[in-house]
A protein has these predicted regions:
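Conserved phosphate/pyrophosphate-binding and hydrolysis machinery centered on Walker-type P-loop NTPases
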Residues: 43-44, 57, 61-65, 92, ...
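Long, well-ordered amphipathic alpha-helical subdomains in the mid-to-C-terminal portions
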Residues: 50-52, 265, 276-311
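The Walker A (P-loop) glycine that initiates the GxxxxGKT/S ATP-binding motif of P-loop NTPases
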Residues: 89
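Flexible active-site lid/hinge loop adjacent to a nucleotide/diphosphate
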Residues: 207-236
Length: 311
């Protein structure tokens, strides 16, 4: 029985559940390494050590959090080398299926992928992106993927701060593509936007006059709108929605990045349009690196989070 229990608590390959089922088990686990061992393990890309370091950062115990901050400080020179992509969308849009499909495409490019979440309302039994891990089973089992649910308590600001720290540790561990998924459409989108390079908004076919209740501010942040579930029976609706969103985007002022946001259609379930979305992301990165916006935005984001940390 004990072996079975310990097995269920262990980190399962690429996915990680920040469990609180047995605090004693976790306390022993996260206190068993020195600062040097944590740093060396992370820099070698060891996912178990990475998970344990993230647990330190998320801990409610001061001594664990302090050690976690020391680990992060030691790892900082190895951060900043990833593409950070924010993904949001209305409930039911198929974010998990999309992340699974896009993630597999990215892994085929010999990249390493970390999937994080911001969901202040999540609980340990009802996690956000890991609420149904079966939707991302292939990613969970891939050696070059790491999936981490949202920190499970605290205000949006606190959750976001820990998510940013997790992002930096993932970069230090060699993950060069980071997805930050946010649940629902609300205040958390602004927070995600403040820590990513590219912001993707997923929508459903059949936008209608209300544009599915999406706030103008969320649409203005989007670098690309992708209408998911554009399949045989809904393809015409998806094309109509595409036109509506294109008309809406045309009313927005030019972006600081020099990029003109686009609208596309896809079917994550049928793996249609996924490659094209990745190509658009690459085009955006090429443009913004070339015109200097990429580095400028990274500096602005770092300054913002430094201010948030101090205050």
């Amino acid at each position: 029985m004990t072996n079975s229990r310990n097995k269920s608590l262990s980190i399962n390959k690429g996915s990680d559940v920040n469990d609180s089922i047995n605090p004693n088990y976790r306390s022993k686990r996260i206190a068993s390494k020195s600062l040097k061992e944590y740093v060396e393990g992370i820099l070698k890309g060891d996912r178990t050590t990475l998970s344990q370091a993230i647990t330190l950062i998320e801990s409610s115990k001061d001594e664990y959090r302090e050690l976690g901050q020391q680990v992060l400080e030691e790892c900082m020179p190895e951060t900043g080398n990833s593409v950070r992509i924010g993904i949001t969308g209305v409930p039911g849009v198929g974010k998990s299926t999309f992340i699974e499909a896009m993630g597999q495409h990215i892994l085929q490019q010999n990249r390493k992928l970390a999937v994080l979440a911001i969901d202040p309302s999540s609980s340990r039994s009802k996690g956000s992106i890991l609420g149904d891990k079966t939707r991302m089973q292939n990613l969970s089992n891939h050696d070059n993927a790491f999936i981490r649910p949202s920190p499970t308590s605290g205000t949006l600001g606190g959750v976001a701060q820990r998510t940013r720290e997790t992002l930096l540790l993932c970069e230090a561990a060699g993950f060069n593509t980071i997805f930050i998924e946010t649940v629902g459409v609300g205040q958390s989108e602004t927070t995600v936007h403040s820590m990513v390079d590219f912001f993707l908004l997923l929508m459903l076919p059949g936008a209608g006059d209300e544009l599915q209740g999406i706030k103008r501010g969320v649409m203005e942040m989007a670098d690309l709108i992708a209408i998911n579930k554009a399949e045989d029976e809904t393809n015409q609706m998806a094309q109509r929605a595409k036109k509506e969103y294109e008309n809406a985007l045309a009313l927005f002022p030019p972006t600081e990045s020099g990029w003109k946001p686009k609208v596309t259609t896809c079917s994550a379930l049928k793996n249609v349009g996924i490659t094209e979305i990745w190509d658009e992301i690459q085009s955006y990165l090429w443009l913004t690196r070339d015109n200097g916006y990429f580095d400028l935005r990274r500096k602005e984001q770092a300054a913002f989070w430094m201010h948030e940390t101090i205050h």
